[in-house]
Amino acid sequence: MSQKIDTSELVVDFVGGAVGHRFRSGEGRGQALAKAAGLTRDATPEIVDATAGLGRDAFLLASLGAKVTLIERSEKMHALLAEGLARAAEEGGRYAETVARMTLLLGDSSLLLPDLKPQVVLVDPMHPPRGNSALVKKEMRQIREIVGTDPDAERLMQVALEAAQNRVVLKWPLRADPMVGLRKPSHQILGKSTRYDVFVKAKLS
């Protein structure tokens, strides 16, 4: 029987820590995530983050000017996100401007995406623990305790590929095998521990 993880300390924080640092550093649209999502000097697509989690990717994209809809099906994680967004908005300035471009929804992305018809969909499934779970960051263990794994990730990707107007981005472990059942991505953008499999349907304008 697996040990239950204490999630009471988990907080969604867009102001401090790594997120706040990235926000203040102003790395811009040259970052891997931004490039994968199609943000360029001439294009700022509307994006749906279909697996919101802690909302960090969505916040980064919104800070770069994109309108981002976050979908989270876990009620507890949705509540943590709502609290984090409210705290960021209270900071005012660029934080408030960024939050104003974000819309948080509670629900199943597979059901919501067809009606939203977004330009870009970002999918970042929760992966089963690999190797010794003690080596996995505490925060990630807490998130997994709340949202579980995503055994329906392939189905979500298929729905996303149908619903997206322009592209779907799958955030995936760098050295992991491709997700079963998907066609070959149009291209990949590689990070230090993550890769973005990009499935292009139409050019962004």
Curated annotation (Swiss-Prot):
MF terms in GO: rRNA (guanine-N2-)-methyltransferase activity
Q: Where in the cell is it found?
A: Cytoplasm
Pfam family, any one: SAM_MT
| CC annotations in GO | cytoplasm
InterPro entries in the record, alphabetically?
16SrRNA_methylTrfase_J (IPR007536), SAM-dependent_MTases_sf (IPR029063)
State the reactions this protein catalyses. guanosine(1516) in 16S rRNA + S-adenosyl-L-methionine = N(2)-methylguanosine(1516) in 16S rRNA + S-adenosyl-L-homocysteine + H(+)
Q: Which UniProt keywords apply?
A: Cytoplasm, Methyltransferase, rRNA processing, S-adenosyl-L-methionine, Transferase
Main site of residence? cytoplasm
Q: Which residues bind S-adenosyl-L-methionine?
A: 56-57, 72-73, 124
Q: What is its EC number?
A: 2.1.1.242
Which HAMAP family did the record assign? 16SrRNA_methyltr_J
Question: What PANTHER family does the record tag this protein with?
Answer: RIBOSOMAL RNA SMALL SUBUNIT METHYLTRANSFERASE J (PTHR36112:SF1)
Q: What does this protein do?
A: Specifically methylates the guanosine in position 1516 of 16S rRNA.
Record family assignment: Belongs to the methyltransferase superfamily. RsmJ family.
Protein name from the UniProt record? Ribosomal RNA small subunit methyltransferase J
Originating species: Brucella anthropi (strain ATCC 49188 / DSM 6882 / CCUG 24695 / JCM 21032 / LMG 3331 / NBRC 15819 / NCTC 12168 / Alc 37)
Q: What is the lineage of its organism?
A: Bacteria, Pseudomonadati, Pseudomonadota, Alphaproteobacteria, Hyphomicrobiales
